[in-house]
């Protein structure tokens, strides 16, 4: 749905009420096809460089805004592609500061995606 560039610029590719194809074959807490029930937020970067302060600030603002507009969302369910599709995805990767986001949102992240069934369709 969204991309947060390294300078904090926000780019929306897909409206939130539509399905975005960010997760692919994936499973979260026993439920496959994460694209059907999630909002995707990508951060520009690589597995080899830390994310910027601007990205974290924008991410925090986006999450707070989404939770206000969609009361059924919970920060307790925030997780990475690497957790819902670990054999295919590596993002946000080892340089993502989960403790920083956890402290900002007042929850323990990343959410536990549960056991992964590599045969699950998505």
What are these regions (language model features)?
Residues 1-72, 76:
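Active-site-adjacent loop/helix surface patches within enzyme catalytic domains
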Residues 32, 47-122:
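Basic/polar, cationic surfaces and motifs that engage anionic cell-wall
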């Amino acid at each position: 749905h969204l991309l947060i560039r390294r300078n904090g610029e926000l780019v929306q590719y897909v409206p939130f009420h539509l399905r975005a194809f960010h997760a692919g074959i994936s499973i979260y807490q026993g439920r496959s096809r994460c694209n059907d029930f999630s909002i995707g937020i990508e951060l520009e970067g690589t597995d080899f460089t830390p994310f910027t302060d601007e990205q974290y600030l924008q991410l925090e603002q986006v999450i707070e805004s989404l939770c206000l507009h969609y009361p059924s969302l919970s920060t307790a369910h925030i997780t990475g592609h690497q957790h819902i599709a670990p054999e295919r995805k590596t993002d946000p990767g080892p340089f993502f500061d989960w403790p920083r986001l956890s402290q900002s949102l007042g929850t323990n992240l990343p959410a536990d995606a549960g056991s992964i069934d590599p045969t699950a369709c998505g």
